[in-house]
A protein has these predicted regions:
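Short, surface-exposed basic-aromatic patches at helix termini and helix-loop junctions that form
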Residues: 107, 132-143
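A general structural motif
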Residues: 114-116
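An active-site-proximal beta-strand-loop segment
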Residues: 48-85
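Mobile genetic element proteins and their domesticated derivatives, centered on retroelements
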Residues: 1, 62, 77, 83, ...
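Basic, flexible linker segments flanking DNA-binding modules
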Residues: 2-51
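Active-site beta-loop-alpha junctions of metal-dependent nucleic acid enzymes
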Residues: 66-70, 87-111
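Short small-residue beta-strand/loop micro-motif enriched in glycine and branched aliphatics
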Residues: 83-88, 171-172
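RNase H-like two-metal-ion nuclease catalytic core shared by retroviral integrases
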Residues: 121-123, 128-131, 145-170, 176-177
Length: 177
């Protein structure tokens, strides 16, 4: 199919319309490697049944950032078993803003603790307020958080795949403000 489109057998389709066809530029390696916070729960201690997707209530979380100069971001949560997606537009990527968005989600969701048992996320600075993120607005702990290894996006693959699909509608450089 891809070769037919490249050979222009389908006049209305272009390479840009294909999900996997468009080439990507390689990122420059940063000089300083990013190290995960050693005091926070790693994905290595995450229970095996979460990785197997045998029960619902386990989510993956990430941010989609807009163009340079744009502060607004999209917070995406993907349920690992059902692939349900929650997308929230936030005014900025500060950790406090993320925490408030999770608080708002908890207040609006009936039976929150049954629907949100754990969240797997990356080591972005916006997700490193561990104590504040796990503290429920109703008291106690709202869910468990597990942090992926640095530069290991495949450890939360469902969310990364959904973010890639979202990027088809909001390509890099989109202003979310």
């Amino acid at each position: 199919l891809y070769s037919y489109i490249s050979k222009r057998r389908f006049p209305r389709l272009r390479d840009m319309d294909l999900l996997e066809k468009v080439s990507r530029r390689r990122r420059k390696k940063s000089e300083e490697p990013r190290i995960a916070h050693k005091d926070y729960p790693s994905i290595e201690i995450r229970p095996e049944h979460i990785g197997q997707r045998s029960e619902g209530g386990h989510w993956e979380m990430d941010l989609i950032v807009g163009c340079r100069g744009s502060k607004a971001v999209l917070l995406t949560l993907t349920e690992r078993r059902s692939r349900q997606e929650i997308i929230m537009k936030l005014p900025d990527r500060r950790a406090e803003t993320i925490r408030r968005a999770i608080d708002r989600l908890e207040r609006r969701t009936p039976q929150f603790r049954q629907k949100f048992r754990s969240i797997t996320t990356d080591n972005g600075s916006e997700f490193l307020q561990y104590e504040q993120l796990v503290r429920s607005v109703r008291g106690g702990t709202r869910f468990h958080i597990y942090y992926c290894h640095s530069y290991a996006a495949w450890e939360k693959g469902s969310n990364e795949n959904h973010n890639r699909m979202i990027r088809r509608f909001f390509p890099k450089g989109t202003n979310f403000d």
